[in-house]
């Protein structure tokens, strides 16, 4: 579908954006030969014509890394980025994909999802769980850091909305998302959760799954502020998060494994500081108390269960010959019956913020 520029804003200046191509594009870059020589046919420019963003395969690249200064003003592109953010950007732009059930997904999904038959129903129900909190209808659903929308369950999450706005730092993931969406209406934008290139109060609901903990710990609050800015009044922000060592249930049932995970996590941080890998998946989990401090008294925040156990629990305790399907059925029923309890003590809560 055709991109509606009226919903967009420049991620660097907050100004409106408009299309440029042909002679208008040449006039903007008349003093920059290195840009004129590139085969960029169209793009978006901000109101003051200080920054240009290319459009590739009908996907606007509204990301700091792809912004081009027109030279008309002192630019902001040299601001240093946290090395952790650079590594996450590289990770998701270098990762390969695999096709499962006619849907393209990241090939690292098997690290976090149990694909065994014994866990299939339990996993499938959890993947659909965010839908009940997103709202019954609306025009725009923002799927921030959408990735390739790598499961049929994820595709269903936007069923109550007219248009799914998929924003991700990976152009490859957006190509896969567009392919997976098929005939469903979608807008695909290369952008960052910390500087969402959408105007204020545009989206009816916002979906943020397994993303926030990959943002630097000091910038997660800013990312939350951006999610809150883009959603309409009374709109829902639905965040699927990992509590990691803040999960009481995982700490009790997986104590030795949790100690190992924490040790490995700390070792990974040390490795990154010493060897400085170009691509590395940053992770930091805040507590639920941190979210409540962010919300304060002016934001309504609720916590429910998305899935109470992680893949380590499933691989250790759940086996077909040992009644694994029976155990998971009762666990899933308990999550449905006591979502707020499991949301507070389980591995993966759904954090719902109402604006």
Per-region residue spans from a language model:
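Short alpha-helix
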Residues: 279-298
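Conserved class I S-adenosyl-L-methionine
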Residues: 63-135, 151-154, 238-265
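A short beta-strand submotif of the Rossmann-like class I SAM-dependent methyltransferase core
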Residues: 208-211
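A short acidic, Gly/Pro-enriched loop at the edge of an enzyme's catalytic core
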Residues: 194-206
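Class I SAM-dependent methyltransferase SAM/SAH-binding core
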Residues: 142, 147-195
């Amino acid at each position: 579908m055709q991109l509606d520029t009226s919903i967009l804003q420049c991620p660097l200046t907050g100004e409106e954006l408009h299309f440029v191509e042909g002679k208008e594009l040449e006039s903007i870059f008349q003093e920059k030969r290195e840009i004129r020589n590139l085969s960029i046919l169209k793009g978006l420019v901000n109101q003051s014509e200080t920054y240009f963003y290319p459009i590739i395969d009908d996907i606007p690249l509204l990301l700091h890394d792809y912004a081009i200064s027109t030279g008309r003003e002192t630019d902001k592109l040299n601001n240093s980025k946290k090395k952790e953010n650079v590594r996450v950007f590289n990770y998701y732009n270098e990762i390969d994909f695999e096709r499962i059930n006619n849907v393209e997904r990241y090939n690292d999904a098997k690290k976090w999802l149990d694909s065994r038959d014994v866990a299939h129903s339990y996993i499938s129900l959890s993947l659909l769980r965010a839908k009940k909190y997103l709202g019954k209808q609306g025009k725009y659903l923002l799927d921030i850091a959408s990735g390739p929308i790598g499961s049929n369950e994820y595709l269903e999450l936007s069923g109550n909305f007219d248009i799914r706005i998929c924003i991700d730092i990976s152009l490859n993931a957006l190509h896969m998302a567009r392919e997976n969406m098929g005939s469903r209406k979608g807008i695909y934008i290369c952008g960052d959760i910390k500087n969402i290139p959408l105007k204020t109060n545009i989206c009816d609901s916002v979906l943020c799954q397994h993303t926030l903990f990959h943002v630097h710990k000091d910038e997660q609050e800013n990312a939350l502020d951006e999610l809150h800015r883009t959603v309409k009044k009374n709109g829902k922000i639905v965040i699927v998060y990992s509590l990691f060592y803040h999960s009481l249930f995982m700490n009790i049932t997986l104590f030795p494994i949790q100690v190992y995970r924490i040790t490995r996590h700390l070792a990974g941080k040390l490795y990154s500081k010493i060897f400085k890998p170009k691509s590395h998946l940053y992770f930091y989990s805040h507590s639920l108390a941190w979210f409540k401090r962010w919300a304060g008294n002016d934001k309504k925040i609720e916590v429910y269960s998305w899935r109470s156990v992680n893949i380590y629990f499933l691989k250790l305790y759940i086996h077909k010959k040992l009644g694994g399907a029976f155990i998971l059925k009762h666990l899933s029923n308990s999550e449905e019956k006591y979502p707020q309890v499991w949301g507070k003590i389980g591995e993966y809560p759904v954090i719902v913020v109402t604006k």
